[in-house]
A protein has these predicted regions:
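Periodic small-residue-enriched repeat registers in elongated scaffold domains
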Residues: 1-44, 146-151
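Short, surface-exposed beta-strand/loop "edge" segments at domain boundaries and coil↔beta transitions
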Residues: 35-37, 68-79, 111, 136-145
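C-terminal interaction-tip segments
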Residues: 138-159
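Hydrophobic beta-strand residues in large extracellular and virion-surface proteins
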Residues: 2, 64-66, 130-132
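Extracellular attachment/recognition segments
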Residues: 74-127
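Beta-rich globular "head" domains
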Residues: 44-92, 146-151
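Short amphipathic beta-strand and strand-loop transition segments with alternating hydrophobic
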Residues: 49-52, 66, 115-123, 133
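Noncatalytic modules at the cell exterior or secretory-pathway interfaces
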Residues: 122-136, 141
């Protein structure tokens, strides 16, 4: 789901300064499975290959709600879970260098452990993207599900 942010060209109240930008918000569902302690990038709808595409010269605020459900494994306990909320932002410059800042991280509920979760750069040379990167213990089978809300400002000014 994507919601647009109005006019492309916006000015201050006196029209002394006008800037061209796109503003939008979106909610994306990411999911995936881990069976060992390998760091894993969640994919859009769990398709195994799609991440969240990004534009340069942008600021993206993110709000992640993520659930980790243990489903077994030799070291896992089926039914253990964690539910967390992580908020932050990423600055993406003209060359697609990304600077991530976490402003808030909270454990909402859990039985067992949390695992780890961060927003990460998943770019290739031809497609620039981000995703939620997750990791837990070896020999634990987990189903991960994340609802990610983004607030994007994409500027035509280079930085």
């Amino acid at each position: 789901v994507i919601s647009g942010g109005g006019q492309k060209s916006i000015s201050d109240s006196t029209s002394a300064a006008t800037f061209n930008s796109r503003r939008q918000s979106s909610t994306i569902e990411l999911s995936g499975v881990t069976i060992d302690n390998t760091a894993t990038n969640l994919t859009v709808q769990g398709d195994g290959s799609s991440f969240i595409n990004v534009k340069n010269n942008s600021i993206i605020g993110y709000d992640i709600y993520i659930t980790r459900l243990e489903l077994g494994g030799s070291s896992g306990s089926a039914g253990n879970y964690s539910y967390r909320n992580i908020r932050g932002a990423v600055q993406i410059d003209d060359s697609y260098n990304m600077a991530f800042v976490v402003g808030f991280s909270r454990n909402i509920a859990k039985i067992g452990v949390n695992g780890t979760c961060i927003m990460a750069d998943t770019s290739t040379s031809s497609l620039k993207s981000i995703s939620v990167n997750v990791q837990d213990r070896n020999n634990v089978h987990n189903l991960w599900s994340a609802s990610v809300t983004l607030h994007e400002v994409i500027s035509e000014t280079t930085f």
